[in-house]
């Protein structure tokens, strides 16, 4: 298995610190709002990577944190007249709802930064003691010049950063690139007691501390969105390695942005969507398959038209699964016949190809193509004459390959019938209202999905083709 390591900017053989085990840390949400589709891609991508590692036999300890104290949270809490804790509690609950709806598996642990104050204060104290941090008026800063390899993850040059970085320059700092690891209390902000007075941690130190306390000095994978590479992940490396003298993370994985209608997503452009808004209109399978239809390191473009195309493609897959489920009830031959054994063995090539694609830096786009190829093959060769054992094997294989991607796990019968009956009702209503364009559109859309309507004296009937 090979993974692309942002730290070295190349694909590397994936060799874990302990054979068969993976320690993985993913930067989670700041819990002051619902997560948007850009966040959703990050969560889906690393959920998929975790699932695939487990599919390949690894025992994965998967930590994804909640940032439940930072400037955005304080601002939002003050605006709505709540406490930061109340705000965090509320949006952690909302996160779990949306993540569950998106079929994201629960982490081994979702630590909250505020649960680790004692450990964070110890972390900061150790950095001061080792000469990597200094205190001024209750604020503690990390000295970037003291850490010789600062910039190794992002490829940034410290001198160039000092000249051109858009940072808040604090004249009290020894160097413009030094960053806060402990912030003194300001009016209206929550604070904790520390050796430097009342205050709260900086964002970067929170993740370093949680990773250290839950996974140890060195971890296998640290992951997050590409926007976190600098300064967040760069600063995590500096703090962690300055404290322990050991490599913080062996492999760094970063997922790319989601653009909306070929533009960067922003509220000012009115192209900002939360995952919840999309999940009200589309099933989780659709959104997951869309998010995984491009390589995780490549930006993807989001639009409703592309989601509709993904839904149509997914419907074709589910139609095939539905046909296999029906065959399972209808076929009369129970056991695998001799002539079917060779075909069953041939189907293994799809599993091997799928693993080959996913082993190459988790190429989900090509893995999905392999599933389509498998289903095309099965549609042609598995029929009413096949044995029940072969039909069941093909169904199980399709679901097996879909599982690491978090798709194709639903039983199709009830949900498909319910959806089609609902669309038939909408078409009948349109016909009564003489809205022929809408009626024809519904009929044509169903036909594209392999569903043919027949108008009979007894009413509308449908069948799959």
From Swiss-Prot:
Residue span of motif 'KMSKS' region: 264-268
Pfam families: CysS_C, DALR_2, tRNA-synt_1e
Motif annotated as 'HIGH' region, chain positions: 29-39
Compartment(s) where it occurs, according to its Swiss-Prot or TrEMBL record: Cytoplasm
Binding-site list for ATP: 267
GO cellular component, one term: cytosol
Keyword Cytoplasm part of the UniProt annotation: yes
CDD domains: CysRS_core
Record keywords: Aminoacyl-tRNA synthetase, ATP-binding, Cytoplasm, Ligase, Metal-binding, Nucleotide-binding, Protein biosynthesis, Zinc
Alphabetized GO MF terms: ATP binding; cysteine-tRNA ligase activity; zinc ion binding
Subunit structure: Monomer.
Protein name: Cysteine--tRNA ligase
